[in-house]
Amino acid sequence: MDPFVVLVLSLSFLLLLYLWRPSPGRGKLPPGPTPLPIFGNFLQIDMKDIRQSISNFSKTYGPVFTLYFGSQPTVVLHGYEAVKEALIDYGEEFSGRGRMPVFEKATKGLGISFSRGNVWRATRHFTVNTLRSLGMGKRTIEIKVQEEAEWLVMELKKTKGSPCDPKFIIGCAPCNVICSIIFQNRFDYKDKDFLSLIENVNEYIKIVSTPAFQVFNAFPILLDYCPGNHKTHSKHFAAIKSYLLKKIKEHEESLDVSNPRDFIDYFLIQRCQENGNQQMNYTQEHLAILVTNLFIGGTETSSLTLRFALLLLMKYPHITDKVQEEIGQVIGRHRSPCMLDRIHMPYTNAMIHEVQRYIDLAPNGLLHEVTCDTKFRDYFIPKGTAVLTSLTSVLHARKEFPNPEMFDPGHFLDENGNFKKSDYFMPFSAGKRKCVGEGLASMELFLFLTTILQNFKLKSLSDPKDIDINSIRSEFSSIPPTFQLCFIPV
């Protein structure tokens, strides 16, 4: 090799090492595997199963350790004690949102999911209060979910017991509920705009669940120069936002400040009252991104969980039989399920909790960030450091759930068959960044599943032992495999 080339390469390598060396400002971060210049620990992580990689690292470095995704350090919390201590005991310090450049580019730092600082605090405060005003957790929203459950039954009956992929039909129900909250109306399941919205949400979730997507978040410099699914992600997000912008403009033209109809109206009224509020930023763009966040979150969480539930209920028909027996005893065949029934249905309630625990829908949640220099255990974590919370390690903790890799509603039942709560149940994360839609999702899962099982027998196309229940895993979500079943009216 040419000596000059060798010299240039050597100097380049030394420069990288110089740039990479830990600086005094990084504090005493937890231990972790040695990172490589530029790549960090990226090459040591299985991007197709980040959960397992994190579990393996925890066996060597303990419940608190550091990984480098590219050049940026990320403190990883593994196990209930570490996650609970950070998100609840040190809730304010760990309430920041970690940098995720692909999402930030799409949301422009607005909305509720990926905003930070005062913008996030004001947006969350407004969102929680508005959802409460619209009846979240009350009979008002319950009626909407019950009505949609009846529409869902009607749509499922149209399959006439023939094999079908439930992905689309099941996704329509929670999507319509969130539509009724955001802009007051539901859609027919054949509506063209509705079909487009559902398709964009499905494609959006599929893209963010790919290993390639994680690469662009770790190496944001690639965003503007390399082709990839990050551009398709932006396209689907923009398509959803564009439709919701149209709805916002319709609301602006018909707004009655004395009679708010839905979430959009509440925002527009608040904009009139607090014009100039720099923390909330009451702009049309902020509203569009906020309702897009709510729309995607309100659709995908329940939709994916419902599909997983159907798959697991086919895999374990003896569990389905027990649930349907309880439905028959408590509700019967001639009235709609309601939330008051849940307290009298411990096995059904336990089954739904076990679905959420077992599928581990958001393995690591979304990245957190410490909002100030933080002393945590024996470590000093500088302000702005990203924090990854392994929700998998909590939901699959053997200490709390004796057979964590088995689907067993008994994990949430005591020795007398009564429903048993667990502090380890964190499918929606915990603390100040906990999902604002947890109550709605829980209501939808109970009412949709009990209504389906009240009206149909689930028939698999194969022997239960041959049903594949392995999810497609990524850092952000778990997606059920494609499957078909028959809804047989009873």
Curated annotation (Swiss-Prot):
Pfam families: p450
Major subcellular site: endoplasmic reticulum
Keywords from the UniProt entry: Endoplasmic reticulum, Heme, Iron, Membrane, Metal-binding, Microsome, Monooxygenase, Oxidoreductase
Domain of life according to the entry: Eukaryota
Swiss-Prot/TrEMBL catalytic activity: an organic molecule + reduced [NADPH--hemoprotein reductase] + O2 = an alcohol + oxidized [NADPH--hemoprotein reductase] + H2O + H(+)
Required co-factors: heme
E.C. number(s) listed in UniProt: 1.14.14.1
Bilayer topology annotation: Peripheral membrane protein
Record has Lipoprotein as a keyword: no
Compartment(s): Endoplasmic reticulum membrane; Microsome membrane
Top EC class, one word: oxidoreductase
Listed transmembrane segments: none
Keyword Cell membrane set for record: no
Protein role: This P450 is active in 15-beta-hydroxylation of steroid sulfates.
Sequence similarity: Belongs to the cytochrome P450 family.
Protein name: Cytochrome P450 2C12, female-specific
Encoding gene per record: Cyp2c12
